[in-house]
Amino acid sequence: MKRLIILIILFSNFAQADQKDERLSELFDKLFLSTNNMEASKLLFNIWDIWSIADNQETQIIFDEANQFMDVGELDNAIELLTKVVKQSPEFAEGWNKRATVYFLKGELNKSISDIEKTLNLEPRHFGALDGLAEIYLIQDDLVGAAVIYRRILEIIPSSKKSQDRLKLINDLLV
């Protein structure tokens, strides 16, 4: 009986995982309306938490191991595992986003952009992927591109101080 309960819990977590999770719509609605930084931070954390759950246990284990490699700076190992993740679960947006992040950290910006595009095709509201893309545009001195992306982030998170500040700075530079 105990094993059955554990299996049900495990299955229910994976059945409600990733960017297709029904809870996300409500969280994004609340995030859009939030004017309280503490509340917005909690909502962002909850969204990331949901995004970080793969649709199957095998992918989840590999994804978690890749995160551990990332945390200790073993980026090549992280990329190797994240490549397995996106091959096993190509609909798992956070797998693509995490690999985009590692490519960014390695300075492989074109590969990062490619994975960001895949992330955004799966989850257009992925503010983390959008923020990464804006950072790349800034590195490439594409202020107009970065401004467009910061506006997109503000459509999702109107209270984002970072996006507001960056957009203001870019607009001041473009004048």
Residue map of PLM features:
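A conserved position within tetratricopeptide repeats
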Residues: 31-35, 48, 86, 120, ...
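N-terminal leader/linker segments that initiate helical-solenoid repeat arrays
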Residues: 16-64
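Boundary/linker segments of alpha-helical solenoid repeat arrays
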Residues: 38-41, 127-128, 157-168
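Alpha-helical adaptor scaffolds
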Residues: 56-122, 128
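Residue-level signature of tetratricopeptide-repeat
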Residues: 99-100, 106, 133, 140, ...
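Register position in tetratricopeptide repeats
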Residues: 71, 105, 139-140, 156, ...
